Amino acid sequence: MNITIITVGKIKEKYLRDAIEEYSKRLGRYCKLDIVELVDEKTPDNASEKEEEVIKEKEGQGILNKIKDNMFVIAMDLGGKQLTSEEFAGYIDNLGVTGNPNIAFIIGGSLGISKSVLARANYKLCFSKMTFPHQLFRVMLLEQIYRGFRIIKGEPYHK
């Protein structure tokens, strides 16, 4: 299985980069992982709603340019479906079984994901109704993907 994480923004904090590196290494046993980092657009202080929408669409165009035609796209979105870890593992497993071995997870920037990217998404997933920094969320997503593969394989880790 090929997993691509397309994300807006760079990771500045060493402890987050270390965690990403650790989970990326662990995932190497289960899938080919590719993390694509896109430049986040600067949002001016007191930006209007229209200015924010323009920024989201610009970031969205960068995301769309990285999505390949054969990718099953899962957008991480507050309006998406919430799953348990077991349901998430089952969903990923089912994608592989049904001929979707190329999965792209999309993490938007601080303003979220553009309408054009949400329209391209095959599935919208929400981890929580809470808001998380997108840098931290990348670690959370990698951990859940790793947990999912451990569940699929029946290996100890998940409790």
Swiss-Prot record:
Leader peptide range in chain numbering: none
Keyword GTP-binding: no
Recorded coiled-coil stretches: none
Top EC group: transferase
Residues that hold S-adenosyl-L-methionine according to the record: G108, F127, S128, K129, M130, T131, F132
Catalytic activity: pseudouridine(1915) in 23S rRNA + S-adenosyl-L-methionine = N(3)-methylpseudouridine(1915) in 23S rRNA + S-adenosyl-L-homocysteine + H(+)
Locations listed in the record: Cytoplasm
EC number annotated for this UniProt entry: 2.1.1.177
Gene Ontology cellular component list: cytoplasm
Cross-referenced Pfam families: SPOUT_MTase
A GO MF label: rRNA (pseudouridine-N3-)-methyltransferase activity
Annotated keywords: Cytoplasm, Methyltransferase, rRNA processing, S-adenosyl-L-methionine, Transferase
CDD domains per the UniProt record, alphabetical: RlmH-like (cd18081)
PANTHER family cross-referenced by the UniProt entry: METHYLTRANSFERASE, RIBOSOMAL RNA LARGE SUBUNIT METHYLTRANSFERASE H
Biological function: Specifically methylates the pseudouridine at position 1915 (m3Psi1915) in 23S rRNA.
Family as reported in the entry's similarity comment: Belongs to the RNA methyltransferase RlmH family.
Matching HAMAP family: 23SrRNA_methyltr_H
Record's subunit section: Homodimer.
NCBIfam families found in the cross-reference section: PRK00103.1-3, tRNA_RlmH_YbeA
Name the record gives this protein: Ribosomal RNA large subunit methyltransferase H
Species the sequence originates in: Clostridium beijerinckii (strain ATCC 51743 / NCIMB 8052)
Lineage of the species this protein comes from: Bacteria, Bacillati, Bacillota, Clostridia, Eubacteriales
